[in-house]
Swiss-Prot record:
UniProt similarity note: Belongs to the glutamate 5-kinase family.
Role description: Catalyzes the transfer of a phosphate group to glutamate to form L-glutamate 5-phosphate.
Gene3D superfamilies named in the record: Acetylglutamate kinase-like (3.40.1160.10), PUA domain (2.30.130.10)
Organism domain of life: Bacteria
Protein name: Glutamate 5-kinase
Primary location recorded for the protein, binned into one broad class: cytoplasm
Originating species: Caulobacter vibrioides (strain NA1000 / CB15N)
Gene name per UniProt: proB
Length: 377
């Protein structure tokens, strides 16, 4: 019989895997755990061969950099931690490159701060880069930019970063590889009566309380069960399910596919539906775009908004802002994230798509892409 976790894993087409320092870095030597990385990448290659897309959110740069700079065995200051991150990033990426290379898979590093997933313009740019990399068959390896991040703009832990990446990438599954095989009613290492919870349909206060009670103290990283539930809450709101499972198994991803013990936290909706609901209901529109009847019909049919169908632009708004789209009778037909600021949108209104670059010197494609449009009902 297929478990809920196993079924979700099989059905997922785009998966974000969060790998913590405790898995990636050997606690005794402070070096990359090559054997574990090779096993993970072999499993990831099998997933890609099955038609799935894989993204990795990887800790480890600071831990690897501490060893390189001789900062182990004591508490580090913030500047020392940032220096360790700078020294460790190349070591981290080299480890991932070497582990994926035998499978003919390339990797690319993406460094983010919280602003990159919360400021819409930067969010759109990060999403476009991620999509391009995956389209080229490359595995994005994402980490927080610890070299420049400050307390005000840091995620705090890579569980929440992974959830934001899953949201940004439109993933349908987030896998948090942990030091425990899922959520329990209490910490099973302290309470022999603790019961495993295989499936969570809603994150209730009771579930959050269990996570607090079962919070694991990590030896190398910063995340515990409470942060994983917080991450799952973010992912769930974005239409992405979350799997919490034991990452230290010899073939961690194959173990999920085989139905080994894990906790599945179900998604609230599909990623696309959740994203469009966010556009429609959570963002304050910054301007108006008036379109002709043909463009209005195309939008209602699920098409992108091309500049040729735009009759008027009212701003000001920036690239990435939400705008209202109305027909020539003043009826709102959609809301969406615009790919041009209001000044550029006014310049290309009414132009054919192949004339945009000649007018602006660049092109971002349609004025609003269909993926970034929520049609009014």
């Amino acid at each position: 019989m297929t478990s809920g976790s196993q079924g979700a894993f099989e059905a997922a087409r785009r998966i974000v895997f969060k790998v913590g320092s405790a898995l990636l870095v050997d606690a005794e030597t402070g070096a990359a755990n090559r054997a574990w990385l090779e096993a993970f990448c072999a499993d990831a290659a099998d997933l890609r061969a099955a038609g799935k897309q894989v993204l990795v959110v990887s800790s480890g740069a600071v831990a690897l950099g501490r060893r390189r700079l001789g900062l182990t065995g004591r508490k580090t200051t913030l500047p020392e931690k940032q220096a360790a991150a700078a020294a460790g990033q190349s070591l981290l990426m080299r480890a991932w490159e070497e582990a994926f290379e035998p499978h003919g898979i390339g990797v690319a590093q993406i460094l983010l701060t919280r602003d990159d997933t919360e400021m819409r313009r930067r969010w759109l740019n990060a999403r476009a880069t991620t999509e391009t990399l995956m389209g080229l068959g490359v595995v994005p390896v994402v980490n927080e930019n610890d070299t420049v991040v400050t307390e005000e703009i840091r995620y705090g832990d890579n569980d929440r970063l992974a959830a934001r990446v899953a949201q940004m990438a439109g993933a349908d599954l987030l896998v948090l590889l942990s030091d425990i095989d899922g959520l329990y009613t209490a910490d099973p290492r302290k309470n022999p009566k603790a019961q495993h919870i295989p499936r969570v349909s809603e994150i209730t206060p009771e579930i959050a309380g269990m996570a607090e009670g079962a919070n694991a103290a990590a030896g190398v990283g910063t995340g515990g069960m409470a942060t994983k539930i917080a991450a799952a809450r973010i992912a769930r709101a974005a239409g992405c399910a979350t799997l919490i499972t034991l990452g230290s198994r010899p073939r961690p991803l194959a173990a999920i596919a085989a139905g080994e013990k894990a906790t599945l936290i179900e998604a609230g909706a599909s990623p696309a539906a959740a994203y469009k609901a966010w556009i429609a209901g959570s963002l304050a529109p910054q301007g108006w775009v008036t379109v002709d009847a043909g463009a209005a019909s195309a939008l209602l049919a699920g098409k992108s908004l091309l500049p040729a169908g735009v009759r008027a632009v009212e701003g000001p708004f920036d690239k990435g802002d939400a705008v209202r789209v109305r027909d020539e009778n003043g009826r709102e037909v959609a809301r969406g994230l615009v790919r041009y600021d209001s000044a550029d949108a006014q310049r290309i209104a009414g132009l054919r798509s192949d004339a945009i670059e000649a007018e602006l010197g660049f092109t971002e494609g349609p004025m609003i892409h269909a993926d970034d449009l929520a049609v009014a009902h």
